[in-house]
Amino acid sequence: MIQLAALVTDVGTSGPFVRVTLAAPTIAPGLAAGRFVLADLGDYLRALLFPARIEAQEFDVLVSPHHPAAALRPGIAVDLIGPLGQGFEIPAATDRLLLVASTAHLPVLLPLTHQKPGSAASLREKPGFSIALLLSAPTAADLYPIRLFPPAVEVTIVTTDGSAGHRGSPLDLFPDLVRWADCACIADDPATYPALAEIVREVRAGSGRRFVQALVVPPMACGVGACQGCAVSVVRGTKLACTDGPVFDLLELR
């Protein structure tokens, strides 16, 4: 864990999000999808930020226009602590990776759609490796633009009102996709997780540990487990999102 003043080098937009680029050469190499930093943005508690794009010297975060980080401007120094937490783990034997996200939670999974030394790159270079994304939103207007994904990512759209893609719920399409996958990573409203877990038990009984991994993000004030404020209920008791997670085996969640 490192504390440093990261320089904002660029601010722009990416679909419905504000994109903020932070130069953090000692933190960026340790980041991965699902790991995070805590940023001092002027409030009493630090703000939780997940990387959406990771390079050797810098990383991007994508936040809603109402997030405190959306007010940052190039040239501002932001005090960061990180990298923190345990991220998504993609087994080296994976040939078929499934990503499941609502647009609101999508930025956490975006590093898995791009090459990154030491993680996704080794998989993306495998012959026959493929990525499928099940992306949901209330309406077409709320979706992250498909054109912003790498061409190799096969995107399936679900909207509640049917204005784009499948009309209904991601639960409608999840069974067939999880049958196909070697590994699945989910970032969505945790209220959907019990139903997703039940589908996994039905169609992929006997799958190995962490076959399906899910993001759980309660308030994380300290990032190091000291405050005990981010407890997550699991099958064998509780774990802390900031140190044991925020990525957990979907089937271990209660």
Put a short name on every predicted segment.
Residues 244-248, 252-254:
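Phosphate-binding loop/pocket of nucleotide- and phosphate-handling active sites
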Residues 216-246:
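Local cysteine-cluster metal-coordination motifs and their immediate loop/turn environment
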Residues 44-53, 85-96, 242:
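Short, Lys/Arg- and Gly-enriched loop/turn segments at beta-strand edges
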Residues 39, 79-81, 232:
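A generic structural signal for residues embedded in beta-strands
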Residues 26, 43, 139, 190-191, ...:
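Glycine-rich beta-alpha junction loops
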Residues 2-74, 138:
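Ferredoxin-reductase
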Residues 70-214, 219:
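FNR/FR-type flavoprotein reductase catalytic core
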